[in-house]
From Swiss-Prot:
Superkingdom of the source species: Bacteria
Top-level taxonomy: Bacteria, Pseudomonadati, Pseudomonadota, Alphaproteobacteria, Hyphomicrobiales
Matches recorded under NCBIfam families: transpos_IS4_1
Region described as Disordered: 1-54, 334-356
Coiled-coil segments: none
Extent of Low complexity compositional bias: 1-19
Name recorded for this polypeptide: Putative transposase y4zB
Family, similarity comment: Belongs to the transposase 11 family.
Entry keyword NADP: no
Keyword entries, A-Z: DNA recombination, DNA-binding, Plasmid, Transposable element, Transposition
InterPro entries per record: RNaseH-like_sf, Transpos_IS4, Transposase_11
Species name: Sinorhizobium fredii (strain NBRC 101917 / NGR234)
A single MF term (Gene Ontology): transposase activity
Gene Ontology biological process terms, A to Z: DNA transposition
A Pfam family it matches: DDE_Tnp_1
Length: 356
C-alpha cells in the first residue's frame, strides 16, 4: 500500500465484487439506467484555472501521500482502544474519468482510476490508501497490505487469492470473505449453531470445509463456511479461517462492510472529486489524496474538540465558515446578533497581523 513514496501504476485484469448482507449501491456511485456508472466529464479549464492545473501536473504526489499517512496514524492513536478487536475493511471504488483523460485505462466497464482503501471502522478513518489504474485487480493490491497479527480482514470475492489468505492465517490474523462461485469446497464436518438469528439475517449452515480440487495444497489452512439467509430471502456464502467466533458474529462482521461503502459515497459527494483541476495522471492522483487528507483533518478536528455531530453536518458547517474566524468547538452555534460590545476579529489563539 502507498502511504509514502511515489505511487506506482499497476496493470492487470480487473477483480470482481460480491453482494453484501446489507446491499448498497456499489461504491456509492449513482446508478444510471442499465446499471452503468456515470463518468466524470472534466470540462475545459478556464484561464483562471490553468495555472493551478499546470502546477498540479508538476507537484510531487508523494508529499500528499506521506501527509495522509501521518494524519491517518495520528487519528489511529487518538481512537485506539485497548482490548478491542482490530477490524480492517478492504475495498476499492472506481473513479470514472471523461474523454479529456485519454491516458486513463479501462477495466471493461469504466475508464479511469481506482481508489483502494483499508478502513478502520473503530476510528472511522482509512488507514492505508492506494490509487491505481481502473484495470488493476483488487487481489493484486491486497497482497501488498502489511498483515497485523490478531486483526480481522473483511473483503469481498474480488480479493480471492489463496496465497494471500494463507499468509493472513500464518500471521495469526483472520479473514472473512465470500468464495467465488467456481470454488469447489468439501465438507469435513458440520458445526453446531448455538445462536442463528442476527440483525436482519439468519445463519442456516456452519461447516468446516476444505478445497475439493486437486490443488488443495494451495490453501493448506482449515476453513469454515457459513450460509446466511438475509431478511429479503436471498442467501449468501461466507468463508473464514476464524474457528472461534460464533457464526452469528462472523456474519455480522461481513454485514458491517457497508461502512466502507458509505465512506466512498461520502467522499465522492462531499469532497469535490467529481471534477478535477488538471486532466493528467499526476493532477488526478494529487486531488484524490488531497480529498482524503481533508477527510482525516475533519475527523481529527472533530475528536480534538469533542464534536459528536454527524460528519456530514460537521463538513457542511466547516465549508460554510471556511473564510470566517469561528471557534470550531462552537461551530454549530449561530453568531451573536448585534453584540453589545465589539469582539476581536480573530480568535485569541490565532496569530494576526496589524499595523503599529
Amino acid at each position: 500500500m502507498i502511504t509514502t513514496g511515489t505511487p506506482t501504476t499497476r496493470r492487470s485484469a480487473a477483480g470482481t465484487a460480491g453482494a453484501d448482507l446489507c446491499p448498497v449501491e456499489r461504491c456509492g456511485e449513482p446508478a444510471r439506467p442499465g446499471g452503468r456508472l456515470e463518468r466524470q466529464q472534466p470540462s475545459p479549464l478556464s484561464p483562471g484555472q490553468r495555472p493551478l492545473a499546470d502546477a498540479n501536473a508538476r507537484r510531487p504526489v508523494a508529499v500528499f501521500a506521506e501527509t495522509f499517512g501521518l494524519l491517518a496514524g495520528q487519528l489511529d492513536r487518538q481512537t485506539r482502544r485497548e482490548g478491542r478487536a482490530m477490524l480492517r475493511l478492504i475495498d476499492s471504488t472506481p473513479i470514472p474519468l471523461g474523454k479529456l483523460c485519454g491516458w486513463a485505462k479501462s477495466n471493461g466497464r469504466i475508464r479511469g482510476m481506482k481508489m483502494h482503501v483499508v478502513y478502520d471502522p473503530d476510528s472511522d478513518c482509512p488507514r492505508l490508501l492506494d490509487i491505481t489504474d481502473a484495470n488493476v485487480n483488487d487481489a493484486q493490491i491486497g497482497r501488498t497490505i502489511a498483515i497485523e497479527s490478531g486483526a480481522t480482514y473483511i473483503f469481498d470475492k474480488g480479493y480471492c487469492h489463496y496465497g494471500w489468505w494463507t499468509a493472513i492465517a500464518e500471521a495469526k490474523a483472520f479473514f472473512v470473505t465470500r468464495p467465488k462461485s467456481n470454488m469447489g469446497l468439501k465438507v469435513v464436518r458440520q458445526r453446531r449453531i448455538k445462536v442463528a438469528e442476527g440483525d436482519g439475517f439468519t445463519v442456516i449452515d456452519d461447516a468446516t470445509v476444505r478445497l475439493a480440487s486437486k490443488g488443495d495444497s494451495k490453501l493448506p489452512i482449515p476453513l469454515r463456511r457459513l450460509t446466511v439467509k438475509r431478511a429479503d430471502g436471498d442467501t449468501i456464502t461466507l468463508l473464514t479461517n476464524d474457528r472461534k467466533r460464533p457464526a452469528v458474529a462472523i456474519a455480522a462482521l461481513y454485514k458491517g462492510r457497508w461502512q466502507i461503502e458509505l465512506l466512498f459515497r461520502w467522499i465522492k459527494q462531499h469532497l469535490k472529486i467529481r471534477s478535477f483541476l488538471g486532466n493528467n495522471d499526476n493532477a488526478v492522483r494529487l486531488q484524490l489524496f488531497a480529498a482524503m487528507i481533508a477527510y482525516a483533518l475533519l475527523r481529527i478536528a472533530a475528536r480534538l474538540n469533542r464534536i459528536t455531530m454527524p460528519i456530514l453536518r460537521f463538513t457542511d458547517l466547516v465549508i460554510r465558515c471556511l473564510f470566517e474566524r469561528r471557534d470550531i468547538a462552537a461551530i454549530e452555534r449561530p453568531p451573536p446578533v448585534n453584540p453589545s460590545h465589539r469582539r476581536p476579529r480573530c480568535s485569541p489563539h490565532q496569530m494576526s497581523f496589524a499595523y503599529v
